[in-house]
Amino acid sequence: MGHLPDPRPRRPINSHSPDSRELLRVPPAWSTGRDLDRPPAGRTPGLRALLSSTVAALCVSACAVGPDYRPPETAAPNAWTGAGEQGTRLVSDAPATGLATWWTSLDDPLLTELVEAALAANLDVASAQARLRQVRAQRVVAASGLYPALGASADGRRANASVETSGRNVTADAYGAGLDASWEIDVFGGTRRGVEAATAEVQASAAQLAATQVSLAAEVASNYVDVRLQQALIRIARDNAASQAETLQLTEWRAQAGLASVQDVEQARTNLERTRAQVPALETSLAASEHRLETLLALTPGSLHERLSAPAPALAVPARLTVGIPADTLRQRPDVRAAERTLAAETARIGQAEAALYPSFTLSGSLGVESLTLGTLMSGDSGVWSILGGIAAPLFEGGALRAQVAAQESVRDQALAEYRKAVLTALEEVENALVALSNNQARDTSLVTAVESARLADTLARERYTAGLVDFQSVLDTDRTVLTVEETLAQNRADGVLALVRLYKSLGGGWSPGANNEPQGDAEP
């Protein structure tokens, strides 16, 4: 149920009355003040009244104070706008497919192996899995409050006392065993709201595990792309250095023949050494990316060097991609799911706080045997039992309980703001990735033409220099242009694959809903 009427007039939150709770113990009407007394035959009106009140409390306990959670409405656009005209061949509004294993679309067996190995061995994933196990156990703890607690005990004792009249010592034995039970009846639903919050926390933790897997797959792929980029840049630098070494040799021959100056020779040497100097810096970046991959796979540095050094196919963006509509993306994104489940948990905790404003009801009892000898412990006359009902109600708390409700409502409002922020961030990231991917394709077309033209210009400049038709500066300029545009093309193609990785990450790729076997509840926005 929703809010129950408040049992007391509201006080301002800043009230300064002292805190206290009055515990009203209500013994059965037949009790003589001793727990082990039995009621006289035929006289159990107190027991009947207690049982009646218990049944009534159980009926009321079907209700729960506090707001009932409803998922917030989220206005998502009908389609993505970031693709633009250049991207219409890359994306569509058909349902996204293959998101769970998107890295296989790059057709690189080693990349697929690395991502799957990371998902199995990564320490961040292991930590998130442990966190999920923790909150599952905490939910069991929360749910245990709905049931009675039962315990068993046994004891034996011997006492010695001196009798003044006779001057003798008297020794007495006593033995006992029994069962004790206690139960706090969840009349106003505070415990059930706690279970509701704990269930939502389990679902949020499962979504956070999925978010960790999504981020991990993207990070492994990004570092793998960077490894291949650094390797490509090293090849480009070495190829250009080889070409520039030939130019230096040609210039030296021409200088010996009196057709070139010493200045031309030194300029050619400078150009060559500058290109060679790029290689160590690129190798440093390559090693860093390899080491990062090894850390993501929980491996020691150097474990993957041999495999990553083997030739591999060039990574390329598929000719056509499919992305779902924005609403599908919001349902797929685990971080959005986690934020929504956190909101549900904080909403349930408002009911927990409100339940503290109302009385609490407890039942306790014991059943056992007591005897002066072990031989008679299990005889029919050794049985003892007791039952006790209690009620505790808050009277003066200085506004603390109401302040706790207000504080929890503020926590709920924070969770709502975080959820809305997660939704907007998800939409932003997809749009940015689509724009980057679209523009990258357009840039790639121009760069391919630029590389072809630069190589042709370099060949013509060398031929004309050999024929003595141009000075050496023309050769230097075309050499530098070739190196620059080839590096730019390699970087742009890597950027295209990285944009694809970011797109799949922003779409929530890298996990399957239900893979953690967690109930989804109202997880959909």
Regions found by a protein language model. Name each.
Residues 10, 14-52:
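Bacterial N-terminal signal peptides that target proteins for export
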